[in-house]
């Protein structure tokens, strides 16, 4: 250390480390690769609560999904890194675009998840 710099130390309990590990695993589960209309990108799953309803959503860059003029009947290919496999995700026609902003390049799309992938949504609850 130069010039009397101080290092702040924080003691962490084992139970806190285990919780961090569990949170990190959940973050990894929610991340995915997206293929749609000859475009690729990344995204992650979030679960929103609006008017006491659970909404399962995919969050990605706006330019990934708008280039193909996405429609409510469309299917997006998703690759789950931890599961090492591609799955197809259907868009929810009622809630298809919940939020988007061209300036910050973000889109949140309502989707219809199969029961076997709902476990990937519990990370970013807003």
Model features per residue range: what roles?
Residues 2-48, 58, 104-107:
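N-terminal activation segment of mature serine protease catalytic domains
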Residues 26-40, 54-55, 62-126:
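Serine endopeptidase catalytic core focused on the charge-relay Asp
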């Amino acid at each position: 250390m130069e010039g009397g710099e101080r290092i702040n130390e924080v003691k962490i309990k084992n139970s806190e480390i285990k919780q961090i590990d569990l949170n990190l695993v959940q973050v990894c589960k929610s991340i995915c690769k997206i293929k749609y209309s000859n475009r690729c990108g990344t995204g992650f799953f979030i679960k929103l609560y609006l008017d006491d309803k659970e909404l399962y959503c995919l969050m990605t860059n706006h330019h990934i999904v708008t280039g193909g003029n996405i429609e409510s009947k469309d299917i997006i290919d998703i690759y789950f890194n931890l599961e090492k496999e591609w799955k197809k995700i259907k868009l929810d026609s009622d809630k298809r675009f919940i939020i988007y902003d061209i300036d910050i390049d973000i889109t949140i799309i309502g989707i219809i998840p199969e029961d076997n992938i709902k476990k990937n949504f519990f990370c970013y609850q807003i």
